[in-house]
């Protein structure tokens, strides 16, 4: 389960970084594709993580007490309720990422900042997924 969590985190992070490639003319289509790939891979990993937690009934927990020690540390825990919402996020994010890759092609002429859109899309999906894993108040507020 830890591998799926880190895959989700890394995929969303790489999708966000790929958005920065979109500013160069030679990488516009590649950048859009990588943004969609990062979002799809991250959502798929989150979907799988949620499905495993629901299927097994075993919660996933990860704690970093040395980070933010005053608030009890950064604590992540995924129980059955959080897993349900992580699945809902994944089910909505995958088609949104795939549709968005084609939809944003019409905005390559510079009318809108596709770099910002791709960056914010992946970061939004990451933080929305991490909110479902928050195990204490400080972690919840940080992810919110």
Could you say what each language-model-derived stretch is?
Residues 19-23, 127-133:
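Hydrophobic alpha-helical transmembrane segments
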Residues 12, 79, 121, 131-132, ...:
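Functional transmembrane alpha-helices
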């Amino acid at each position: 389960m830890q591998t799926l969590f880190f895959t989700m985190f890394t995929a969303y992070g790489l999708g966000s970084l790929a958005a920065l490639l979109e500013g160069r003319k030679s990488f516009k289509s590649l950048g859009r594709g990588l943004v969609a790939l990062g979002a799809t891979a991250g959502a798929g990993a989150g979907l799988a993580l949620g499905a495993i937690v629901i299927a097994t009934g075993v919660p996933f927990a990860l704690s970093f007490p040395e980070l933010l020690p005053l608030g009890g540390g950064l604590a992540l825990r995924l129980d059955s309720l959080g897993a349900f919402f992580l699945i809902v996020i994944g089910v909505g994010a995958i088609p949104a990422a795939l549709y968005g890759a084609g939809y944003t092609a019409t905005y390559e002429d510079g009318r809108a900042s596709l770099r910002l859109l791709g960056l914010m899309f992946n970061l939004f999906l990451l933080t929305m997924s991490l909110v479902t894993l928050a195990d204490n108040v400080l972690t919840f507020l940080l992810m919110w």
